[in-house]
Amino acid sequence: METLAPPVVAVVVAHTPGPWFEETLASLHTQDYAELSVLVLDVASTEDLTARVAAVLPTAYVRHLDENRGFGAAVNEVMAMVDGADYYLVCHDDVALFPDTVHLLVEEAFRSNAGIVSPKVVSWADPERLVHVGMTVDKGGSVVDRVQPNEIDHGQHDAVRDVFVAPGGCTLVRADLFAELGGYDTAVVAMGEDLDLCWRAQVVGARIIVAPDARVRHLEELAGGARALDPALLASTGEEAAAHPVTLQELQRRHELLAVFKCYGRFHLIRVVPQVLVMAIGE
């Protein structure tokens, strides 16, 4: 049956995922959106993920990447691999979508003429607890959540609204916008990819929104500290993990500052940089 729904490709970046991965795949399999294809990028996993993917989502495509150069670099592969998609649904390997998530994101993208759409992100273990409902940023580039830690969802954040950052985990991105931006900045190997992409998208005039009716559970294995950062990523940035074990917070702040210097205009930088330096000294 022919449909007018725009084609969406879900791009799942997986690196040695744990037992939760099957639930991630199953949640994509049960989507009520007809024009959804799934591409799993197996990024230097210790074991081939093909069999695990096929057992749950046999229609998915699997692409193996031998080197882990970061989340953004992996997602960028989609631009050379996929033709005809109107949207990319960029996913971590530890998210679980509700059955109507994709169609609600696409509907709101059309209704609001948005380039990037974020769902309401809730706790993996307790979906009544909010994790993210879009994010904002201060003048120094630091990302600020719009919800409190362990805040209970009573519908208080259920209005569609513009946000500065669509937090990583599960993000709908218009394919032509992604191509115009050149994808993710591969210098941002981990932590801060979402801020960088969204800030650059706004520089070219794109709208970023949160659509809270669409919901996603997120385990947040890396950000929560349950999964270690791949040492290969540190090596790619020139860091020596043994000599200086860089923290996720340090990486996040480094990439926030990178976004500031890339995205602010010259005159705004002259005003903001001294304030950022003072804040850095205070920290």
Model-assigned labels for residue ranges:
Residues 98-138, 142:
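Conserved donor NDP-sugar-binding/catalytic core segment of glycosyltransferases
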Residues 204-283:
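Active-site-adjacent helix/loop segment of glycosyltransferases
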Residues 26-35:
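Short, acidic, metal-binding catalytic loop of nucleotide-sugar glycosyltransferases
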Residues 142, 150-173, 195-196, 240-244:
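A recurrent flexible, glycine/aromatic-enriched loop bordering the glycosyltransferase active site
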Residues 34, 42-50:
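A conserved acidic beta->alpha catalytic loop
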Residues 88:
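Short aromatic/hydrophobic "clamp" motif used to bind/position activated sugar donors
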Residues 164-222:
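A short, conserved alpha-helix in the catalytic core of glycosyltransferases
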Residues 65-83, 93:
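Glycine-rich, basic loop-to-helix element that forms the pyrophosphate-binding segment
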